[in-house]
């Protein structure tokens, strides 16, 4: 069997992990085993939270739209139903932005949806 030397490979692998762990506190950025655990955890959290961020923003937009529509005497669910019937194709992100930055145009949209 031929001899396999893999010192460079191991060093490269460890340096890669320590580079990813840069900025972590204490031994989490210095010791390979602990740094490796922290990097794995960080990557796991990042993966999970990229998906969670989409849900969180949707909840935020819904809360903002609900607050704005209730000022006009309509609940969120009724408003969304009216929008569908009126065939107004604005997504929740746009509606929330309008409600926050341009209340006048948002009130016009509420009126238009209410007529349908």
UniProtKB/Swiss-Prot annotation:
Q: Which UniProt keywords apply?
A: Ribonucleoprotein, Ribosomal protein, RNA-binding, rRNA-binding
Q: Which GO terms describe its biological process?
A: ribosomal large subunit assembly; translation
An example GO CC term for this entry is: ribosome
What would you give as a GO molecular function for this chain, any one?
Answer: structural constituent of ribosome
- What HAMAP family does the annotation carry? Ribosomal_bL20 (MF_00382)
What this protein is reported to do is described as: Binds directly to 23S ribosomal RNA and is necessary for the in vitro assembly process of the 50S ribosomal subunit. It is not involved in the protein synthesizing functions of that subunit.
* Protein family membership: Belongs to the bacterial ribosomal protein bL20 family.
* Listed name of the protein: Large ribosomal subunit protein bL20
Organism for this UniProt entry:
Acaryochloris marina (strain MBIC 11017)
């Amino acid at each position: 069997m031929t001899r396999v030397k893999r010192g460079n490979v191991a060093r490269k692998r460890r340096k890669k992990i320590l580079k990813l762990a840069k900025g972590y506190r204490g031994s989490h950025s210095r010791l390979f085993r602990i740094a490796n655990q922290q990097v794995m955890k960080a990557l796991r959290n990042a993966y999970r939270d990229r998906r969670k961020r989409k849900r969180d923003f949707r909840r935020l937009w819904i809360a903002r739209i609900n607050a704005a529509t209730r000022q006009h005497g309509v609940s969120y669910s009724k408003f969304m139903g009216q929008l569908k019937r009126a065939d107004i194709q604005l997504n929740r992100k746009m509606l929330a932005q309008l409600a926050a930055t341009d209340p006048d145009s948002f009130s016009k949209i509420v009126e238009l949806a209410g007529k349908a």
